[in-house]
Amino acid sequence: MHGSLRLLVLLCWGATLATLATATVLEKSLGTPYIQTSIYGAWWFTGLWVLCALLSAFYIMRSQLYRRLAFILHVAFAVILLGAFTTRLTALHGEMHLAEGNPTNTFTSGAQSHTLPYTITLTRFEVTYYLGTTAPADFIAHVVIADPELASDSGTVSMNRILSRRGYRFYQHGIDEDLRGCTLLVAHDPWGIAITYCGYGLLLLGMLLFMGTDKGFRERIQLFAKRPTILAIPLLIALVGAVGITRASNPSHRASPAAPVANHSLLEAPPASQQALAVSASTAPPKTLPREVAAQFGTLYVYYADRICPLQTVAYQFSLKLTGGFGYRGLTPEQILMGWIFFPSSWIDAPLIALPRGRVRQLFASKNGMVSWREFSDSSYQYRLALPLEQIRRGEYPGNPQGVLAADEKYHLIQSVTSLRLLGIYPLPHNHDSTAIRWYSPVDRLPEALAGQERIFIRKGFDYLAELAVKGDYAALSAAVAKIRQYQQRNATKVLPPAYRTRAERLYNQLARPRPFAFASLSIGLLLFALLTASLAGFLPSQPLWITRIALGLAIVLLAVISGIIALRWVASAHIPLTNGADTMLFMGWLSLLIAILRHRRFTPLLPIGFLSAGFALLVAALGSANPPITQLMPVLSSPLLSAHVACIMLAYTLLSFISLNSTMAILLRCLNRNTKTAIEHLSDASRTILYPALFLLAVGIFIGAIWANVSWGSYWSWDPKETWALITLMVYAAGVHTHSIPRLSRPMPFHIYMLAAFACVLITYFGVNYLLGGMHSYAG
């Protein structure tokens, strides 16, 4: 009976995992609304969870497992499920549109309309912007509540700032184009949220009690660390990052949103460039400015990607987008950009445009994937991508259209540079407000009231610069650049970023190259991994101490370099860099090296495993984006919960990657020499020790993310593919600590094999969802 009950529990949980995984895959093809209704919203899905909970509770009681400290953790999960079930039964979600000055007391949920017990009136709506830009920092609705049962009150609703009244919670959701109205999300779920949050609190309490009082866990943790202080380091970073995010998200001015800086028409060229775009058959290397002069242009400020940054940043992004790297024929990114601006005829035949792999290369008959700008026109002077783009528009393109779209983007990016529309370097006050600045390019439509001399300076300035560049009068050219910089300082001194931030960004542009560090880390890790495996298998003597010391020194150097890159990006962006895939992978590499350095003496394989884990993380960061652009934080990301959520999740993934590499070593030892039982058991003990904090951190990261989602969107769980796979990962790895229920996993080799297979869940959670399945957490877009 006991064995049958255990099998039934395992089958039930297995069916739940299979359902969740299948739903995320089907969502990609069938769409989110269908999956939300047919699976997540179906009563059989709710019943499956209830059945799992009841069977598990019955099994725990029959096995008398309630006498253990871990019982608190199981009760916490039961309370969380009860909260979710309560939300399923009683919660109400909808939308309310507010128009300025019009009292409203109704909101809609689907096709149904619901009445509030009070009236809300929007008195004023405003958008705050990051200083000197048109990038929104927050959307704020000022409202007055007229309640017949309570005193009238006023309040505000903004991103990550909820307005609560008599069980109803209001969240900022959308704005009207005229800025005289907004849409609020309305949530009424007092019981479900309260019960779920109690479950989160009980879960945290259970974890703390388990780590502090469970004798078996404390004995295991001695293998890894005298004190688990290492786990507090990323959380401290998250706390500091939260403060940084809060400060960075405080807007410095309020204004009506200005129109975009430039209408990026890509079909025009300024007078200075029209003749230069003539056909040139020259085979000489592309002409450009000297390195020092081009670098001076890089010190100018430019309005780019909704932020004020050095022109050097634009040059690096331009070079990366075109060539896939940060140079061409020994020229710097600034020289490449200046070459296209001042000497385009010398560049149109240079094969520096990297085409994506696939069918797009066949259109150009390119073998190595590198083409010139001229090759985008065929022998009839027709745009080579015109037909494929039309096929894509009609949905008739035979294959993945991303390659064609990427190539088209590169072509038009060059046009935007040669037409000077990308160069918004001239700041002008907007509406007589010294902090409301618009940045103009030489070809933008300038304000009618602009004085004649200043208008000529902006409109004809680059013609003069082009003339000096062609003449080779670099002294005069440098002086002209200095005048533009003085103009920027005079007109935009209150909104320009601090000098230290600009210096940090310029240095970051030059140093942020994760690819060579990734290969170095992987090479060192593979060498150490092979030496240690051979030593444990008996093929080599014990690893000499000097090898460990050299490896430790290299790890410290690599950690210092990565720390510097992260610090520079943090300073340049004014918020903790944990908001995209490359950032989180860089952080994971940093964590891997930090843990390996601090605890390698207590666990010998930790150093090679740390190098390998860091190397893979850095390689993914390099493949994703060698130098991800620095951007302003989206308003919804300006929450102190974000950094804590990401830090916990990434630390958990780092520890789980350690376990997978540990298991890899154990399996190799088993294959190479069957007389390695002691070493395999030692690796198993280490993995079990690491597994507990990894699971706890993953669980904490998930429920911090749920709280953040509830604060931002009014729903603490929405079955987004990323959060669903994070839950799957937690459930799969949790089996590794339930050796009483799954006795086979108490044996070292089955445990190692299971842990290695379980790591596929981490890979799917991060890479599969981010780049394939999509969702709110996806970086695929």
Segments and roles (model prediction):
Residues 1-781:
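Solvent-exposed, non-transmembrane regions of integral membrane proteins
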